[in-house]
Amino acid sequence: MAQTHISESNIIIENKTFSGAHFAREVHPDGTPRGTFRSYTVLCDGDNVTFRNCVFENTAGRGKDVGQALALYLDGDNITLEDCILRGHQDTLFLAPLPEKEIIPGGFLGPKQFTERKRRVYRFKNCTIEGGVDFIFGGATAYFENCVFVSVEEGYVFAPSTPRDVEVGFVAKDCRFVAGDDVRDGSCFIARPWRDHGAVEIINCYLDAHINSAGFDDWGKTHAHSTVRFIERGSLGEGAKGKRADFVKVII
């Protein structure tokens, strides 16, 4: 299965479909497990790149069976996706930079493990992103407008690792959080912090009943309740009801 690496800057890519099926537990040609960051279908590290009407998918399967499997790995600056579809399960979309250090030795094995952690900004408009566990993750500043986030299994939409000194992490405005077939009510969360200063803000979004009444999860990191930056403004739908976790700032 070919992987696509896009390194050219200042380009527009339209009407393309990229499909792959590599996964973290797969044995790499070098004899080691492939790992998360070598499982991508597409890696784009060019700057000022726009994708329009493109499809990115990783069909390896559920995370419980294959581990992480990236459809799209972004590590350029000022990348925009318009009217695109992303499909996967665990870790569908990675938005660089990586955190400074891995928790598990070798956890960042891949094309960017030793590169400088540069601040990145990404924009998504009118996109559909499907996944299960932590399916949008990373340390970037990313804006999602009029997008649909489809939870295809129980899990978490966002897993931010926003650096402490970066004010804005992931922002979703006028988006829809919906459930795939057979996803139970209350079985999914908007976000959980991959690192202690993770930042997510959702604004005027529709939340289906699969979103748990707590809204956000702390990933067992009670020490991070005072450092995470989870903000919710003007949510609608069944998933907007109930008492939010006490580390979430809700603005009516």
Whereabouts are the PLM-identified features?
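Sequence-level preference for short, compositionally simple segments enriched
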Residues: 1-252
